[in-house]
Structures are given as structure tokens and as C-alpha cells.
Amino acid sequence: MDVEVNYSHAYLLAEDDDCYPDGMLDDSPTHPVGIIRVEKGIAFLITGLHTGTVSFTVAVADQDPGADLEGYEDIVEISFESPSAYISLYEAGGAGVHGIPSLSAGPGTYRFRYHARGMDAAREENFSDVVIDHYLLQIWPALHSDPVVLKSTSSYFRYWLSAG
């Protein structure tokens, strides 16, 4: 799906959470992953493009679908606590809302694996209505575990990783 971003982000909200994030959520203090930050019912997804159109794919599965290590430059994982089986992808500022398949195990703990491709090229362009960067968010039920960086290639990802 094409998603409009402003200020290099989009976010997920659980259906019963009507509060948009006030600003950037904090990264995990013990295991930073840079480009995704979570609190209960909210996930803040950082993109390379500052303003314009990015490509998002969200895949909800019953079990770990496996990372796409060849197709993406940067890949991170983090646990997410959802108070609802229903979440949506919101464009920055709530301008647009994209439905996502319901979470297979209902409310509970899930693993998010966030893949990114083209962040450096998108950051150089900064503004674009043509898709430059692509994102895949895989979601499946899992016990809580520490955040982890599976693959780190882009300099923009490394910037966010060090920004904490």
C-alpha cells in the first residue's frame, strides 16, 4: 500500500487506543533498534523519506514467517503489546488510515519485524510523490523478547540507531 509520510514517520495504533503519539517514542534503552519504537498499543515507524509517498506491506501471520534478508537493507525486531486484535496503520498526523488484518491471537504480545529498503536514497531526495523507499512489517504472536537488529546496511539506519 502507498502511505503518505510527514516528518519521516507513520505509526500503528491499536483500535482501542485513541491517542496519537505526542511525538517521537523512546528507543529501547538496553537494546536500541533505531527505526521502530513501541509503547503499549502504539508503534512509531521511521522512514527515510521526510515527506511524500512510501510503500508499506504489513503481513500478519500465525507464526514467525522468516525475515527477507535478501530483499531489504535494514531489518529489526521488537516485541509489541496490543490491547486489541485490531490495529491500523496511520499516516503522520492521522491524515490517512489503512486497515490491517486482525491480529491472529487477539490481544496480547506480538513480535514486529520491520524491514526497510531505500532509506538512504529517500533521505537524499527528502520530498517525493514517487515511491523510493519500501517497508515490510511482519507481525506474529510471540513471547516478549529483547529487541534485535538482524541486518544493518544503510547509513540512515545507523544514524537512528546511534540517535537512541
Language-model region placement:
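Generic secondary-structure microfeatures
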Residues: 47-49, 60-64, 80-84, 91-93, ...
